[in-house]
Amino acid sequence: MARKKIREYDSKRLVKEHFKRLSGQELPIRSVQINQETDLNELVEREPWLSSEKLVVKPDMLFGKRGKSGLVALNLDFADVATFVKERLGKEVEMSGCKGPITTFIVEPFVPHNEEFYLNIVSDRLGCSISFSECGGIDIEENWDKVKTITIPTGASLTFEICAPLVATLPLEIKGELEDFIQVIFTLFEDLDFTFLEMNPFTLVDGKPYPLDMRGELDDTAAFKNFKKWGDIEFPMPFGRVMSSTESFIHGLDEKTSASLKFTVLNPKGRIWTMVAGGGASVIYADTVGDLGYASELGNYAEYSGAPKEDEVLQYARVVIDCATANPDGKSRALVIGGGIANFTDVAATFNGIIRALKEKEAKLKAARMHIFVRRGGPNYQKGLAKMRSLGDEIGVPIEVYGPEATMTGICKEAIQYITAAA
């Protein structure tokens, strides 16, 4: 399971669309998104309610506590909304220690209300927990003792008997309505492969539940079976995180291939860099460097898998090596080319792309005092490792090569020993 945050706009879009599909009832949610590309005149023509109703506007940037931070404006007309957005669009703010520009806003009808409820559903490996409170809103944390929680084991259904403790203290006139609402939202949560869904608050309009503020996360590994249900979904970068040009390039490669190519710069000045085959293995290598006390020296996270073509590996390896060798400072560096034991991927074939990139970057590798550590197993691995061994002599760069007889992460310790001994 990979939990990916989505914007509030998309959370509400999914809930609105699929609440009706699953229950036959309409949730009167209306919202629009505004960013740098939005033509406000066209937006009003497409959504005429924007010019006839009082509105709410707030950033839609994956961070919370917007109300307490003065970033929510209420009871505005559209001209005021446009001014609010213009004054803040692209401006940098700091939230919970993270700084970044505000690029996206959500605009909705202003709904006067007296009641504020809280609903939260979270999934984990054992099932789901559902939390509910009659005291929702911005002070939910101060009223956490009033939150009731139930647990639904994996594979179990949410029956009215199980749900009963959540709504036990509600007035009779709204108890049934909210119980039905929680039932449908939980069904929707599972049907769409949400991993997290929070409404804080939701209220009642004409006796019917109406979500005012919403946060959602989806299991993006379920995208293959939900592409029609999710529609044009966006998984934004976390607030404060902006892709570098190199990361954007690899992301573009990844989008165009059936293989997997991932690359994230963690510390541009780090002295340990990785290029690891396999999603699970890549995490293990990164964790091992951290567990050995050298997380601060880890330059990147990198993973390739799914039998990428040689040219794709070549382009990928060029980027990793360019970042790993940038701005040589006389200190030694290590490049870990690791992986587990492949089942189907031809190790020699994927190594061909890496070897070509290493040859191209010979001068950069030497200038950065790079030492390369290789560990791999799988189909045709002997041929691939032999090529790596001969490459070291050919380009004059030290390369330590190991097969499946060595522990998978042993080269992490060797890399650390190298950079510390040479310090």
From Swiss-Prot:
Annotated protein name in UniProt: ATP-citrate synthase alpha chain protein 2
Name of encoding gene: ACLA-2
GO BP term (any one): lipid metabolic process
Protein localization: Cytoplasm, Cytosol
Residue pairs linked by disulfide bridges in the UniProt entry: none
Protein family membership: Belongs to the succinate/malate CoA ligase beta subunit family.
UniProt keyword list: Acyltransferase, ATP-binding, Cytoplasm, Lipid biosynthesis, Lipid metabolism, Nucleotide-binding, Transferase
Reactions the enzyme catalyzes: oxaloacetate + acetyl-CoA + ADP + phosphate = citrate + ATP + CoA
Job of this protein: ATP citrate-lyase is the primary enzyme responsible for the synthesis of cytosolic acetyl-CoA, used for the elongation of fatty acids and biosynthesis of isoprenoids, flavonoids and malonated derivatives. May supply substrate to the cytosolic acetyl-CoA carboxylase, which generates the malonyl-CoA used for the synthesis of a multitude of compounds, including very long chain fatty acids and flavonoids. Required for normal growth and development and elongation of C18 fatty acids to C20 to C24 fatty acids in seeds.
Self-association state and partner proteins as the record states: Heterooctamer of 4 alpha and 4 beta chains.
Binding site for citrate: 343, 345, 376
